[in-house]
A protein has these predicted regions:
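Short helix-onset patch at the extreme N-terminus, typifying the N->h transition
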Residues: 6-8
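Solvent-exposed, charged helical/coil patches
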Residues: 191-211
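Interfaces and regulatory segments of ATP-dependent nucleotide/adenylate/phosphodiester-chemistry enzymes
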Residues: 2-3, 12-190
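Catalytic centers of nucleases
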Residues: 206-240
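Hydrophobic/aromatic-lined pockets within catalytic cores
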Residues: 169, 198, 216-220
Length: 240
C-alpha cells in the first residue's frame, strides 16, 4: 500500500522562515545560550551550512522548515514517493521558498536555482542507506545526524531551525565582501589643483588635457557621448 505524502504550504513556510530569520542572532555565543541543542548536533549544523558541497547547504533549511510547518512529516524525505511515513516533496519547497530566500540574502548559500536537482540529492531520502552514492560522505553524515535527531526529538524542530538560521546569518556576515571606497576630493580642492596645473604656459596643451578629461568623465557618467577626441592645438594660452 502506498503511504500518503504531505504537501507543505508555501505561504506558511515563507512566513515562518521570515519570522525566524528576523530572530536569528548570527552569533555562536547567543545561539549556545538559547538552544540547549547537543554540541555534536550544533557542530554538524555549522559544518553543513559551511559545506564545500553547495547542495548540502540548502538541505537543513529546507528539511527542518518542513518539520516546523508540519510535525508529522519525516524531515529526511526528499521525494514525495520516498516510501517514508510522512513523505513530502522537498525539492518543491526548496525551489519555492529557500532558493528565493537565498537570493535576497546575497546568495549566502551559494546562489543555486535548483539545488535539489543536483546529483547529491537525486535520492528518495537523506538516510544512511544512500551514503555510498555520495562523494562528500562526511558531509552527508552530518545531514543524517541532524535530521535523525529532529525525527527522534520532534519538539526541537523550531530550535534546530533557529540554530540553522543563526549559522546562515553568521556565514553571511563572515563572507560579506568589503569594497574599497574610492578616494574623493572636494570641488574646491579640484579647482585648486586645476589652477596649479594650468599655471605653467604650455601652448594650450594642459588646458586641452583638462577639458578632454572633463568631457570624458561627463560622457561616461551620464552616457552622453560615444567618443571624445581632441585635435591639434592651434591657439596660444593667451592672446598676445
Amino acid at each position: 500500500m502506498t503511504r500518503p505524502s504531505y504537501t507543505i504550504s508555501t505561504d506558511q513556510a515563507k512566513a515562518l522562515l521570515d519570522k525566524l530569520w528576523t530572530k536569528a542572532s548570527g552569533t555562536i555565543s547567543a545561539s549556545k545560550a538559547e538552544s540547549r541543542i547537543p554540541d555534536e548536533i550544533r557542530d554538524a549544523i555549522d559544518r553543513s551550512i559551511d559545506s564545500k558541497t553547495k547542495t548540502y547547504r540548502y538541505v537543513l533549511p529546507t528539511q527542518l522548515l518542513a518539520k516546523c510547518i508540519e510535525p508529522d512529516v519525516d524531515c529526511r524525505s526528499v521525494q514525495a514517493g520516498s516510501g517514508l511515513s510522512g513523505a513530502f516533496d522537498a525539492r518543491s519547497l526548496c525551489h519555492k521558498v529557500v532558493v528565493p530566500f537565498d537570493h535576497v540574502n546575497n546568495n549566502v548559500l551559494g546562489g543555486s536555482s535548483e539545488p535539489y536537482l543536483n546529483n547529491p540529492l537525486r535520492i528518495p531520502a537523506i538516510v544512511r542507506d544512500e551514503r555510498q552514492a555520495q562523494k562528500a560522505k562526511a558531509g552527508f553524515d552530518d545531514l543524517c545526524l541532524v535530521l535523525e535527531y529532529a525525527e527522534s526529538h520532534p519538539k526541537t524542530a523550531h530550535k534546530l531551525m533557529s540554530e540553522t538560521l543563526s549559522a546562515i546569518r553568521l556565514r553571511m556576515e563572515l563572507t560579506c565582501i568589503t569594497y574599497a571606497v574610492p578616494n574623493r576630493i572636494s570641488l574646491g580642492q579640484s579647482l585648486s589643483l586645476a589652477d596649479r596645473f594650468l599655471a605653467d604656459p604650455t601652448g594650450g596643451l594642459r588646458l586641452q588635457v583638462v577639458a578632454e578629461a572633463l568631457f570624458r568623465s561627463i560622457g561616461e557618467r551620464f552616457r552622453l557621448f560615444d567618443q571624445v577626441r581632441s585635435a591639434s592645438i592651434n591657439a596660444a594660452d593667451a592672446s598676445t
